[in-house]
């Protein structure tokens, strides 16, 4: 069995809405291992993105716990939580969130500079990752000069440049046409295999989700394996 990266134990989430107690997630159990790809599908509002935020330590469960590399995220102070998250997790969203005033190379360097790498080390690692996503020749271009697919590739390069244990992606192909969506997903799966990174992708697209080794369905705040899925 490959290395266990993330583990959910009885995770629930509820919010107060006026005088109402709104439950979003119900007693979820989930394990994410290195090199494993997991797709999470479900209708809008089913709790997919909430779960991803909790897995990433961006939100905390109301019940249960999440372990990242064996550490219970609820017990950590903000500094330790941020350090653990930055070291072991990468994030990709539907919108690329590239900084428009910087080049593709500078955007990909950013997590390494935040992590106190020298500019020389950061530039070398960022260029190597841009080459892996097929953007080395576009490294000096700003976000506005890149196509939609190129911007998302740059965002994925930025998420992977720190070599995280797991990449969490929320609708990463949602703003792309079908051809670009397939290309971006192909690249993510190739890099997952090459780098040994765990991959968790939230998507509404059943066809794309079918490419993952494991597909889970979120319905009414509960998570179940998809019938007929590969794993």
Curated annotation (Swiss-Prot):
Residues 6-231 form the ABC transporter domain. It is found in: Cell inner membrane. It is an enzyme of class 7 (translocase). Keywords: ATP-binding, Cell inner membrane, Cell membrane, Membrane, Nucleotide-binding, Translocase, Transport. One of its GO terms (cellular component) is plasma membrane. Part of the ABC transporter complex LolCDE involved in the translocation of mature outer membrane-directed lipoproteins, from the inner membrane to the periplasmic chaperone, LolA. Responsible for the formation of the LolA-lipoprotein complex in an ATP-dependent manner. The keyword Ribonucleoprotein does not apply. This is Lipoprotein-releasing system ATP-binding protein LolD. Its main location: membrane. It holds the Pfam family ABC_tran. GO terms for biological process: lipoprotein localization to membrane. ATP binds at residues 42-49. SMART domains: AAA. It is a peripheral membrane protein. The complex is composed of two ATP-binding proteins (LolD) and two transmembrane proteins (LolC and LolE). Its EC number is 7.6.2.-. Belongs to the ABC transporter superfamily. Lipoprotein translocase (TC 3.A.1.125) family. GO terms for molecular function: ATP binding; ATP hydrolysis activity. It comes from the Bacteria.
């Amino acid at each position: 069995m490959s290395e266990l990266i993330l583990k959910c134990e009885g995770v629930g989430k509820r919010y107060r809405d006026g005088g109402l107690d709104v439950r979003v997630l119900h007693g979820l159990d989930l394990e994410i291992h290195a090199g494993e790809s997991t797709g999470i599908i479900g209708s809008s509002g089913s709790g997919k993105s909430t779960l991803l935020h909790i897995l990433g330590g961006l939100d905390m469960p109301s019940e249960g716990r999440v372990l990242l590399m064996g550490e219970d995220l609820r017990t950590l102070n903000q500094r330790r939580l941020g350090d653990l998250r930055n070291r072991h997790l990468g994030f990709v969203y539907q919108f690329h969130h590239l900084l428009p005033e910087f080049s593709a190379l500078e955007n990909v360097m950013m997590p390494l500079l935040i992590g106190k790498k020298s500019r020389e080390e950061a530039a070398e690692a960022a260029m190597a990752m841009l080459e892996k996503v097929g953007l080395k020749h576009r490294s000096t271009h700003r976000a506005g000069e890149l196509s939609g697919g190129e911007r998302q590739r740059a965002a994925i390069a930025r998420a992977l440049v720190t070599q995280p244990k797991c990449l969490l992606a929320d609708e990463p192909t949602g703003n792309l046409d079908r051809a670009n969506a397939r290309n971006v997903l192909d690249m993510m799966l190739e890099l997952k295999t090459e780098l040994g990174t765990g991959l968790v992708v939230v998507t509404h697209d059943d066809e794309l989700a079918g490419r993952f080794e494991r597909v889970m369905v979120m319905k009414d705040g509960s998570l179940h394996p998809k019938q007929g899925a590969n794993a």
